[in-house]
Amino acid sequence: MPSMRILSWNVNGLRAIYKKGFVDWLMIDRPDVLCLQEIKATEDQIPKELNGLPGYISFFSPGARKGRDGVALFTKIKTLSLEYSLGLPGFDDEQRAIVADYGDFLLFNVYFPNGKASKERLSYKMRFYDLFLDLMDRLVAEGRDIVICGDVNTAHKEIDLARPKPNEKISGFLPEERAWIDRLIEHGFLDTFRLFHPEGEKYSFWDMKTRA
C-alpha cells in the first residue's frame, strides 16, 4: 500500500474556518485525506466552493442537531464505498460519522459524543464507546485494517491537557472515559498523535468552556 498522509481536525465550525482561509491552507498543505469534525453546519450552510475543490472529492454528514456535531471528508483518493453511519442501533441519528473504504483499510471519521451536559449524555457517550469498540473488534476479526480519525471527546492522560487536576471530575477526563481509551489501545490501536509527539505541552484535548 502506498503511503498516505491523513489529517484529522476538530474545526469547531466549518463556516468559521472557511472565512479564515481554510481553502488557501488546504491547497497549500494538500493532505491525501482530511477528516473534519464538529462542522456545525446544515447542508444548505456548507459553502458551495467546498464541493468542488481542485484535486479533492468532498463528503459531508451535517449534524442532525442544528449548530452542532457533523463531520466532513476531503479525499484525493477515490473510495470503494462510503457510509454516513456506523450501523449502531439508536446512535446514528445524530450523524456523527463517515466511513470510507479504501480497499486496503477502512477509515472512520467520527465525532464522538460529549458527556458534559448531563448524566444521561455521559451514559449515552459511554454506551456509544462500548458499541463502537465492539464494531472495531468485529471488523478486525474479519481481517480489516482500520484507521480511526476523530474527536473522542476525552483526554487520555495528564499529558493530553493543560490542567488535568481541575478536570478529574469533569466529563472528558473521567476515569471511566480514560479507561475506554486504554481498552482501545489494548485491542491493538495506536495513538498516533502521541507516537509522533511523546513530549509534554503538546496537547490533544481542548475544551472551549474551560479553556484547557
Question: Where do the model's predicted regions map?
Answer:
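Active-site-proximal beta-strand elements of phosphoester/diester hydrolases
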Residues: 4-12, 104-116, 149
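Active-site beta-strand/loop signature of hydrolases that rely on acidic residues for catalysis
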Residues: 10, 26-44, 107, 136-158, ...
